[in-house]
Amino acid sequence: MELKVLNTAGAETGEVVTLRDDIFGAEVSEHAIWLDVKSILANKRQGTHKSKTRAEVRGGGRKPYRQKGTGNARQGSTRSPLMIGGGTIFGPTPHGYDQKVNRKVKQLARRSAFSAKAQEGRILIVEDFALAEIKTKPVADMLRNLGLDAKKILMLTPDYNMVIARSGRNIEALNIMTAEKASTYDILNSHTVLFQKTALKKLEETLG
């Protein structure tokens, strides 16, 4: 597959980049994608949820009323799970949600995600650019020129660039990261993947 390289003004530069078939033209493995995305979302969970049992709730040491003669059901504590303010039966307890996915499956999932985007025509290549100062306007103008200003965009750079990263972080629909760090979830959670030209080489090195 070949794609034309665009400049930040949205015009063609005359240069054409060939995308590797094993990354952008592979058969999409939905199962690998499912495994990887499921593990990514699960690993984001803190797992610190906790509710108190009747033994942990403060108070309740005194019997609320006498055993007999009131007409009420017998109660030994105001912190019984049956009463307001009481403990919780079988409530949530802290535990980890981590799920391990083999490296080969992760690689297959990323290749499948990029291939799916390529099949949908949602991959763009822009020439490498640099910003002199941290400013949102140049990045916003570039997205507008490329027709991406109203869409959720994943922009991949070859290396971490603090100026570009900070210039784009005020744009809610834009997610900027290095090509090697883009996960399957990041790719699929965007409408279009926007590559800086040299970021393609970094991605090829990462995926082998």
Curated annotation (Swiss-Prot):
Region feature (Disordered): 45-83
Keywords: Ribonucleoprotein, Ribosomal protein, RNA-binding, rRNA-binding
UniProt record, GO biological process: translation
UniProt-listed Pfam families: Ribosomal_L4 (PF00573)
Gene Ontology molecular function: rRNA binding; structural constituent of ribosome
Annotated protein name in UniProt: Large ribosomal subunit protein uL4
Gene Ontology cellular-component terms listed: ribonucleoprotein complex; ribosome
Keyword rRNA-binding in annotation: yes
Subunit structure: Part of the 50S ribosomal subunit.
Family indicated by similarity: Belongs to the universal ribosomal protein uL4 family.
SUPFAM superfamilies membership: Ribosomal protein L4
Superkingdom assignment: Bacteria
Residue spans of biased composition, Polar residues class: 69-80
Keyword Transmembrane helix: no
Encoding gene (name): rplD
